[in-house]
Structures are given as structure tokens and as C-alpha cells.
């Protein structure tokens, strides 16, 4: 049974995150998916990010909605970009264009340590309605919702009576 790793911050759990998680379970078949969730300490985003527990709860909610049994996955806290994937015997790592370079570096380090290389499964970005990738940053800026739908700009006028 394949052992699959996937990781991320998973802020504003959106359709791009869903695609990564779905691909991880598809590749794992009946094996186990190890999900690395970025710790609060590791974050340095240009926008505020919810705490670890809140992001973990969004992730768990989605996995439960998929109907995945508890024994098919494990969520671990990532305190560095690699997490357990440098040491443990994973078969696959699921990546987005953003995390692909990290997976390449991870395989170089694994090779230096004499470990089996991870098979990298590359998942393309999910595009918003405007053809630009869905991202947590765009959601934080109010440009799109979690499904990539454009938000209408509403102008507020102050009127004095």
C-alpha cells in the first residue's frame, strides 16, 4: 500500500487545497496519507494566517466530508519545509507548482542520505474565474472566494443627513 505525503499551510481551505488532498488519497488507494500542516511558528505570510488548530479543523472537516476513515490519514505539525518526508519511507509526495522546488530539494537530500527518492506527483493550480490561480493571498485580499469566484467590489458611501 502506498504511503503518501502532502503538506501546506491550508489557509482559507480552498479548491486548490481540495485538489491536492483528493489527489493524495487517490494515489494512496488503501494506503495512508500523511498531511503536514505548517506550524504557527513557521509562518511568515504577507497576510494574517489563522492559527494551527483552526486550519487543522478546516482540513479535518474536508476529509470527513470526503468520507475518509480516520485510519487512512495522519496530520502532523510541520516546523520546517520538509517535515518527516526526509526520514520516513514515503512512496509519493503530492505538490503544487509552489511546493515543487521543495520536493526536488527534498529528493536531493534523501539521495545524499541513501534513501529512496519520492515519486513527485505534480498537481496544477486550480484557476479562478479570471484565469488566475486560486490562492489564500487572493482570498485574504477579498479578490475571490474559496471556489475562485470573483467578488464584486462594493463601494460604500457615507451620507450625511
Swiss-Prot record:
Reactions the enzyme catalyzes: (R)-4'-phosphopantetheine + ATP + H(+) = 3'-dephospho-CoA + diphosphate
A single MF term (Gene Ontology): pantetheine-phosphate adenylyltransferase activity
Gene3D superfamilies: HUPs
Any matching Pfam family: CTP_transf_like
UniProt entry keywords in alphabetical sequence: ATP-binding, Coenzyme A biosynthesis, Cytoplasm, Nucleotide-binding, Nucleotidyltransferase, Transferase
Cellular location(s): Cytoplasm
GO biological process, one term: coenzyme A biosynthetic process
CDD domains xref list: PPAT_CoAS
Pathway in which this enzyme or protein is active: Cofactor biosynthesis; coenzyme A biosynthesis
Superkingdom assignment: Archaea
Protein family membership: Belongs to the eukaryotic CoaD family.
Role this protein plays: Reversibly transfers an adenylyl group from ATP to 4'-phosphopantetheine, yielding dephospho-CoA (dPCoA) and pyrophosphate.
HAMAP family xrefs: PPAT_arch
Protein name in UniProt: Phosphopantetheine adenylyltransferase
UniProt organism field: Methanosarcina barkeri (strain Fusaro / DSM 804)
Gene name of the encoded protein: coaD
